[in-house]
């Protein structure tokens, strides 16, 4: 008792614990500890732990007392509101990497959720993160220095979740820049929004309690409680109950007794549940968070104990359930991953669809059951075995620290054969057994699995560059599981190692026959494919300087194509399959990786990297990027191949890189002439074009293009602000400029908005830090010119007003040119293209344009080039398509094409003997029919009995069934021998069919009613013309106005003769007009059924109600009648009458609608519709007539006639030849065309520095 009194004297009533320094507090705790250290009572141990926890807490309060919030601040009231109504919490939204929030209430509150920060709008906060380290009983906080911005604390507290102490957080309410947050904000300790509310609430309550001085009596009463520590729980409970029932007890003393009893109950509960052994501190904060320290004025301690006990039991059960759920979920994910890698994506996608339809996609147990059910026995065993291997591998990685793990990782990730073989030698030293080929090679150091024998053999074969047959033979002995799938290439067999379950590499797939490969046809189309895809890859490659992108793509073709040929025996077919395309892409990206790798190894090579990546990035980083790019860019090709997995692509990519390194070594690119390319880029930049256009409008430079070096230099200096020589003298500017984009042919302005690789501007192409210099100059100069333009605006506006007088005529002329129809038909007699309007009939071409005199189709695969200059030798070169890029330069132009079958020139096909062609085609058809008839059946009876590719009964060779040209004598002999037999069997089959047809009784059919003969009524034409206030000849000329003067049309002069053919374009033109009229009329009748009717129809009925729109179908007549039937008959029998019939029907339909009298509410609608439709048809026809007497010379002579064109015809003079011709389209689509592949301007020669 004396010891207790001493303690009571030290901790006397009224002492403010916040006034004690650290030494005094430690002395107090130590003395209490010395009093209780001899006791074995578990309650005393818990009380000691509580004292230490309380000491730590008070120390933190003392340290932060000056920074605690004022009790009068509105945050307290707001937090209380949140506790009552959590729905007023601000809504968190995330946009990319920016973190923003729009609060629904006050701005004083902020929340932290997961790894996202939620703050009021425009009020970012700063976080100072701290992590917690738990010792035996007393939690100690250690700050992790991650300060962001300035130090301005507002709130402080512990965060508790259940009975587990989690994190200690400081929150600051001062603005911080976004970049700092992105850089340093990762890993900042955060928690859920509920805990933030809870710890803020508990801290305010606790702070109020400590500032009130109530802590002193708590310490005193704890000391007094030690006097009664030997009393049993029942007596103590009775003692407390008697105190509570006494009316004279002071309220403060009553509360003290309740706290004592409450703490005793806590001690008892701690001794029951071991989960509380982490100390009193977590529970202390649980009390404040849940508000249970209201026991000071509301005795509810028993209710709390029951609630806490139940909660801890539930928490323990939930933890066990969560652990099991996590384990099953991980297993389900691994099953899917293994299935995609080993079996393919198709089956895994099917399982996902089944689970989605059944609503079990979130149930891991259902996923596991469905995977096992969908797989066969071998597949299920493969998946289960692989999962157990992965799980075992996880355990090994966690526990095992053997040196062989690092070596195996280096072996499997090696990018060169020599490097992998060297690592393999180091691994073999660790083998527990030598020459093991039936089981895993174990490590003699740790005893765990080291390397599968098939991997050991595979590395050796690759390093020795073994042939396909050798690899297949040696690796097949490891195969124990195979999977057969069928795709668009046929059956594919995937074999897996029976030891480790890993797929044996792709070179043993599709090995059923020796003469059929899986790669498909690799003709010139594949060369074009590689060239095009390499150019596309330039969009993400960063070159250190300007490079020749043609050279880049050509090297890729020369490097990749031979390696692709060597993969398998090549099929000689007309097209290549998706697997071949995928191989090509893999080797293209391996070629790019080799260039990057070479630039890192040899500093003399041009630096090559990936946009957004540093030049010194690791090779693995580049591999990861290229693999991701490959799978994203070519997912369409990959999805066509059901057996292709991500692991398959990664393995082949690694092998392709090894082969390229082994065959070509380090590779580099040459650099283009910086001066020429830089000037080209500047002149073709849209920004430069804008500045130059403004300067021409303003009058600062001439309107025409520069014609002399002096004019070119003057224009360049006006736009840029300095001469080319001055600009190029700044070496630091253009030395670091680079470009990696496939630049489109800007000389074809019609394709500016339709090119695949068009970049934004010069700023994107240059991309270096020096680009701001030239961009700033261009912008400043463009702005100066624009200001000058504003100053001269009045003069310009007067000239513009003068031009406006003729704008309508100019627009009409452009509309005429836009609607002109061109038919580019190659005339073999003249060697030129026919360009005609729609007033012509198609020319009948001879059959020799398609077939030669042997009945074989032409193949125009030989290109005939002639020298542009007559002095050039040789004067003519004939090359195949694949050799164009090698042998042809800009001194030659394409003159003709030659057939590789019959060797005739394309313009000479008209000279072939037509009768021979027809005879050969007839014979070829006869042979095809004959041999198709006897493909299976034998003329001697039954089926063919082939031995050594020859039927032993009739003598038919298998190779002449489909090939009638290689052995013509055998083909004719066999045909002559069995021709009579063929005719007899054919007639016999035909007679049987005739008998079947005769046996069928005829059905009675009603005779078709004869239609009334049609007669032309010219009165309808006159009546229509009168309403429209035009000449009847104009109505009669619908469909036949093209190329005629409108003055002649009105007078009825110069009308073309009546059509004599059903294919006459005038019939199609008038019929189209009628169909358009009927279509729009039906839209008007049934407008209530349209969601989006034509705008001009909707405008007519916008004032009607929905009921009135529905009634239009009832009140408006059907004007179609028998038009389509009658027109079709007349078009065949009498084309001239068909033309007049269509025009008359159009007039009748117009008059029928125009003369409607009732109901009154539709009269105006129908009349306006009829007038609008017919006027539109006639105005469209007028645009096709010849232009009038408008004088285009007011625009200047260059506008009408350019170059050597002396034609006086307005249309032909205005149309520049070759603008839309096939030669332009072919050249743009041909990546091997030499003409203008590189952008070049004549002005470059004038701009060269002097």
Curated annotation (Swiss-Prot):
Q: Where in this chain does the entry annotate a coiled-coil region?
A: none
Q: Its GO CC terms?
A: host cell cytoplasm; virion component
Upregulation details from the record are: Expressed in the late phase of the viral replicative cycle.
Predominant location category: virion
* Assembly, per entry: Interacts with the minor capsid protein p17 and with the hexon capsid protein p72 capsomers; these interactions form a rigid zipper structure that stabilizes the capsomers. Interacts with host IRF3.
Compartments annotated for it: namely: Virion; Host cytoplasm
The UniProt keyword set, sorted, is: Host cytoplasm, Host-virus interaction, Inhibition of host innate immune response by virus, Inhibition of host IRF3 by virus, Inhibition of host RLR pathway by virus, Late protein, Viral immunoevasion, Virion
Record's protein name: Minor capsid protein M1249L
Q: Which family does it belong to?
A: Belongs to the asfivirus M1249L family.
Can you name the source organism? Answer: African swine fever virus (isolate Pig/Kenya/KEN-50/1950)
List this protein's GO terms for biological process: symbiont-mediated suppression of host cytoplasmic pattern recognition receptor signaling pathway via inhibition of IRF3 activity
Report the superkingdom from the record. Viruses
What job does the chain carry out? Answer: Together with the penton and the other minor capsid proteins (p17, p49), forms a complicated network immediately below the outer capsid shell, stabilizing the whole capsid. In addition, blocks IFN-beta transactivation mediated by the cGAS-STING pathway and regulates the transcriptional activity of IFN-beta. Mechanistically, suppresses the phosphorylation of host key adapter protein TBK1 and degrades host IRF3 in the cytoplasm.
């Amino acid at each position: 008792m004396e010891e207790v009194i001493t303690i009571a004297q030290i901790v006397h009533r009224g002492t403010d614990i916040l006034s004690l320094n650290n030494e005094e507090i430690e002395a107090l705790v130590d003395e209490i500890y010395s009093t209780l250290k001899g006791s074995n009572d578990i309650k005393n141990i818990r009380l000691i732990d509580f004292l230490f926890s309380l000491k730590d807490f008070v120390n933190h309060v003392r340290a932060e007392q000056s920074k605690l919030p004022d009790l009068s601040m509105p945050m307290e009231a707001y937090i209380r509101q949140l506790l009552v109504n959590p729905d007023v919490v601000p809504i968190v939204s995330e946009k990319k990497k920016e973190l923003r929030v729009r609060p629904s209430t006050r701005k004083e509150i902020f929340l932290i959720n997961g790894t996202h920060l939620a703050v009021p709008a425009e009020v970012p906060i700063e976080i100072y993160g701290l992590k917690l380290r738990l010792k035996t009983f007393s939690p100690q906080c250690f700050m992790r220095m991650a300060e962001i911005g300035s130090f301005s604390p507002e709130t402080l507290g512990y965060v508790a979740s259940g009975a587990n102490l989690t994190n200690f957080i400081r929150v600051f309410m001062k603005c911080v820049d976004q970049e700092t947050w992105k850089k340093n904000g990762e890993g900042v300790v955060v928690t859920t929004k509920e805990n933030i509310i809870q710890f803020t609430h508990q801290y305010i309550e606790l702070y109020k309690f400590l500032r009130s001085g109530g802590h002193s009596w708590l310490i005193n009463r704890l000391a007094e409680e030690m006097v009664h520590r030997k009393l049993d729980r029942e007596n103590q409970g009775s003692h407390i109950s008697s105190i509570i029932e006494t009316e004279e007890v002071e309220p403060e003393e009553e509360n003290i007794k309740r706290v004592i009893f409450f703490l005793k109950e806590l001690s008892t509960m701690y001794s029951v549940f071991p989960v509380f052994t982490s100390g009193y501190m977590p529970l202390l904060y649980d009390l404040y968070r849940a508000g249970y320290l209201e026991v000071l004025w509301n005795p509810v301690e028993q209710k709390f104990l029951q609630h806490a006990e139940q909660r801890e039991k539930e928490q323990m059960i939930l933890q066990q359930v969560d652990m099991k759920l996590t384990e099953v979920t991980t297993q389900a994910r691994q099953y899917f991953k293994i299935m995609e890698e080993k079996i393919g994506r198709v089956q895994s996608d099917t399982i996902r669809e089944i689970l989605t339809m059944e609503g079990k996609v979130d149930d891991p147990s259902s996923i596991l059951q469905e995977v096992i059910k969908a797989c066969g026995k071998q597949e299920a065993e493969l998946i289960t075995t692989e999962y157990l291997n992965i799980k075992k591998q996880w355990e090994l990685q966690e526990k095992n620290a053997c040196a062989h793990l690092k070596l195996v990782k280096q072996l499997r990730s090696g990018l060169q054969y020599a490097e992998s073989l060297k690592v393999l030698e180091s691994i073999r030293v660790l083998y527990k057994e030598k020459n093991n080929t039936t089981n895993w090679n174990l490590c003699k150091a740790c005893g765990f699995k080291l390397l599968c024998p098939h991997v050991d053999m595979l590395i050796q074969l690759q390093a020795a560059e073994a042939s396909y047959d050798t690899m297949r033979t040696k690796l097949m002995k490891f195969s124990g599981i195979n999977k057969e799938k069928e795709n668009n290439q046929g059956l594919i067999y995937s074999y897996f190692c029976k030891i480790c379950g890993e797929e044996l590499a792709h070179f043993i797939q599709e090995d059923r026959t020796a003469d059929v490969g899986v790669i498909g046809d690799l003709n010139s189309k594949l060369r074009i494919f590689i060239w095009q895809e390499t150019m596309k890859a330039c969009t993400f490659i960063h070159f250190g300087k300007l490079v020749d992108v043609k050279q880049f793509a050509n090297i890729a073709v020369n490097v990749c194509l031979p390696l692709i040929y060597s993969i398998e025996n090549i099929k000689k077919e007309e097209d290549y399959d998706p697997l071949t395309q995928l191989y090509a892409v893999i080797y293209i990206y391996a070629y790019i990786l080799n260039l990057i790798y070479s630039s890192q190894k040899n500093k003399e090579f041009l630096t090559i990297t990936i946009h957004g990546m540093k030049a010194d990035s690791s090779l693995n980083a580049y591999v990861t990027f290229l693999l991701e790019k490959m799978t994203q860019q070519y997912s369409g090709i990959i999805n066509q191949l059901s057996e292709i997995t991500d692991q398959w692509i990664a393995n082949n990519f690694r092998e392709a890189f090894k082969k390229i390194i082994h065959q070509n070594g380090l590779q580099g690119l040459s650099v283009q002439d910086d001066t020429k390319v830089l000037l080209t880029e500047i002149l073709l930049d849209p920004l430069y074009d804008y500045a130059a256009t403004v300067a021409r409008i303003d009058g600062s430079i001439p309107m025409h293009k520069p014609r002399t070096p002096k004019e070119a230099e003057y224009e360049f200096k006006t736009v840029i602000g300095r001469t080319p020589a001055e600009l190029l003298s700044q070496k630091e500017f253009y030395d670091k400029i680079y470009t990696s984009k496939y630049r489109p042919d800007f000389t074809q302005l019609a394709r500016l908005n339709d090119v695949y690789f068009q970049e934004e501007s010069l700023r994107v192409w240059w991309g270096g830090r020096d680009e701001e210099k030239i961009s700033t100059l261009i912008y400043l100069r463009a702005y100066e010119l624009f200001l000058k333009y504003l100053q001269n605006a009045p003069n310009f506006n007067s000239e513009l007003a003068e031009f406006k007088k003729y704008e309508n005529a100019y627009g009409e002329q452009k509309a005429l040119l836009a609607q002109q129809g061109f038919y580019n038909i190659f005339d073999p007699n003249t060697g030129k293209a026919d360009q005609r309007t729609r007033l012509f009939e198609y020319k009948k071409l001879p059959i020799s344009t398609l077939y030669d005199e042997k009945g074989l189709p032409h193949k125009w695969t030989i290109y005939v080039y002639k020298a542009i200059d007559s002095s050039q030798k040789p004067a003519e070169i004939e090359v195949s398509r694949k050799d164009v890029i090698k042998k042809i330069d800009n001194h030659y132009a394409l003159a003709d094409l030659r057939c590789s079958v019959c060797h005739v020139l394309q313009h000479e096909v008209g000279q072939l003997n037509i009768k021979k062609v027809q005879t050969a085609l007839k014979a070829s058809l006869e042979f095809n029919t004959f041999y198709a008839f006897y493909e299976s059946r034998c003329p001697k009876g039954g089926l063919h009995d082939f031995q050594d590719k020859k039927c032993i009964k009739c003598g038919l060779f298998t190779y002449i069934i489909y090939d009638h040209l290689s052995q013509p004598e055998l083909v004719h002999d066999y045909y002559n021998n069995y021709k009579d037999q063929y005719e007899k069997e054919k007639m016999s089959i035909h007679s049987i069919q005739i008998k079947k047809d005769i046996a069928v009784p005829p059905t009675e059919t009603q005779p078709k009613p004869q239609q009334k003969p049609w007669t032309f009524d010219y009165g309808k034409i006159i009546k229509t013309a009168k309403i429209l206030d035009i000449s009847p000849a104009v109505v009669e000329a619908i469909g036949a106005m093209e190329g005629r003067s409108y003055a002649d049309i009105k007078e009825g002069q110069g009308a073309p003769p009546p059509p004599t053919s059903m294919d006459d374009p005038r019939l199609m033109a008038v019929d189209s007009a009628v169909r358009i009229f009927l279509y729009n009329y039906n839209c008007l009748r049934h407008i209530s059924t349209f969601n989006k009717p034509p705008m001009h129809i909707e405008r007519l009925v916008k004032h009607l109600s929905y009921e009135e729109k529905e009634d239009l179908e009832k009140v408006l007549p059907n004007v179609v009648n028998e038009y389509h039937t009658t027109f079709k008959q007349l078009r065949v029998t009498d084309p001239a009458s068909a033309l007049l019939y269509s025009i008359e029907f159009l007039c009748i339909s117009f008059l029928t609608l125009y003369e409607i009298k009732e109901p009154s509410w539709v009269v105006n609608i129908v009349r306006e519709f009829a007038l609008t439709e017919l006027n539109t048809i006639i105005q469209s026809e007028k645009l096709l007539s010849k232009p009038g007497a408008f004088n285009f010379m007011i625009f200047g002579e260059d506008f009408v006639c350019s170059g050597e064109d002396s034609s006086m015809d307005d249309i032909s003079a205005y149309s520049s030849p070759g603008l839309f011709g096939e030669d332009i389209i072919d050249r743009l689509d041909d990546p091997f065309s030499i003409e203008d592949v590189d952008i070049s301007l004549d002005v470059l020669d004038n701009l060269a520095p002097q």
